[in-house]
């Protein structure tokens, strides 16, 4: 189920130019990744705050917690840094997250640029440590 479902989502994203989450909704919202992650983490006994933060990193609500803000920002920045399913996957920073963090779009662009300058070195260092 999951491999075929995942491929259907990627195909839909590519055809429609939408996000992974939007593709999940458009294809019936069966087993969306927020719900699946929440269920897996509940079984892992990682704590309620982390379960809820991961389970709401796209549906952040009006007053997201600090952890939700961190996860949401990291998720969107990872797309900006080239770690998305598709090269042109839309980036959707939640206004509530940016507001709570006191960030403007230009701040996010600056953060992305600083991260992209150092990221290759960080990845190389990590790979040296784990190998």
Which role does the model predict for each range below?
Residues 1-131:
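Metal-dependent nucleotide-binding catalytic modules
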């Amino acid at each position: 189920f999951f491999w075929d479902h995942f491929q259907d989502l990627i195909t839909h994203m590519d055809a429609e130019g939408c996000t992974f989450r939007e593709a999940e909704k458009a294809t019936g919202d069966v087993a969306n990744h927020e719900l699946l992650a929440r269920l897996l983490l509940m079984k892992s006994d990682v704590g309620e705050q982390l379960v809820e933060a991961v389970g709401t990193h796209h549906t952040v609500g009006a007053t997201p917690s600090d952890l939700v803000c961190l996860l949401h920002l990291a998720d969107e920045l990872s797309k900006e840094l080239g770690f998305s399913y598709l090269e042109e996957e839309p980036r959707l920073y939640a206004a509530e997250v940016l507001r709570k963090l006191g960030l403007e779009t230009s701040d996010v662009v600056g953060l992305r640029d600083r991260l992209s300058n150092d990221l290759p070195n960080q990845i190389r260092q990590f790979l040296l440590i784990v190998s």
